Amino acid sequence: SNCNILLADKKGNMVVVECTPILKKVRAAETFENGSIVCTVNSFTSDEMKPYDDAKGNDYDSHRRYRTVLDSFSSERIKDEYIETTEHLLKGDYGFMCQYDDEPDFETVWSSIFDLDSLVIYRAEGDPRKKKFVTDNRLHDLIRRG
């Protein structure tokens, strides 16, 4: 089936791989004045892969969510306190993200923030407006054990 895989390392190298069973496209990070980010949603965002998107637009506004992320970083709303301001972004404070109140059969499964400096993951399981972001140290612990 189709999928998006987000890859990043501690050095700041990051990409998204948009995949179908027969084709893949590696999408580079988006670079802004205050750094680079990768973002993935429930659809393909590269022009090359859009024709292979099986959702045919029935993707719960994933392109709108993707645009909200890019706009928030390009406008420098996300700066200084990256973790805190990114939590606000994912809660929908800067535009549409996960506000599916009128969709009884669709919910956000989780929202994640990856801190490449500390190798810590912050994750809200469920709607980030209702669920707290908790620290997930599994990656950090795995690397520390070596």
Segments the model singles out, each with a brief description of its role:
Residues 3-146:
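C-terminal, well-structured catalytic/ligand-binding subdomain of enzymes
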